[in-house]
């Protein structure tokens, strides 16, 4: 079974930056999640990246991940009316070295 990854891009409101980082530092791994990363891509821009054992593990974790997102949603800037505050993508790992 192929590993699966998800990536979520977001921008944090300036006055919520420290609170956003604190919430992520307290985040535990979800069942089926092999690892997770928060990368800073700009002054207030971030991508959350996670590697999963399988797509089904990611799907099972979605309700809990949405709860986490709802708890921090007020800290993030809207990317666009179509996307809201996050730009998520996911897919199977095609190559790993």
What is each PLM-predicted segment?
Residues 1-70, 74-97:
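Short S/T/G/P-rich N-terminal loop/turn motif that feeds into the first structured element of a domain
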């Amino acid at each position: 079974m192929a590993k699966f990854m998800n990536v979520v891009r977001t921008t944090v409101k300036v006055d919520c930056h420290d609170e956003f980082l604190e919430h992520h530092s307290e985040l535990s791994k979800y069942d089926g999640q092999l690892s997770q990363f928060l990368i800073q891509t700009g002054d207030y821009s971030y991508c959350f990246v996670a590697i999963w054992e399988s797509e089904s593990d990611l799907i099972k974790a979605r309700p809990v991940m949405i709860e986490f997102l709802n708890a921090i949603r007020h800290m993030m800037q809207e990317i666009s009316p179509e996307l809201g505050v996050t730009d998520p993508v996911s897919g199977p790992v095609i190559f790993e070295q």
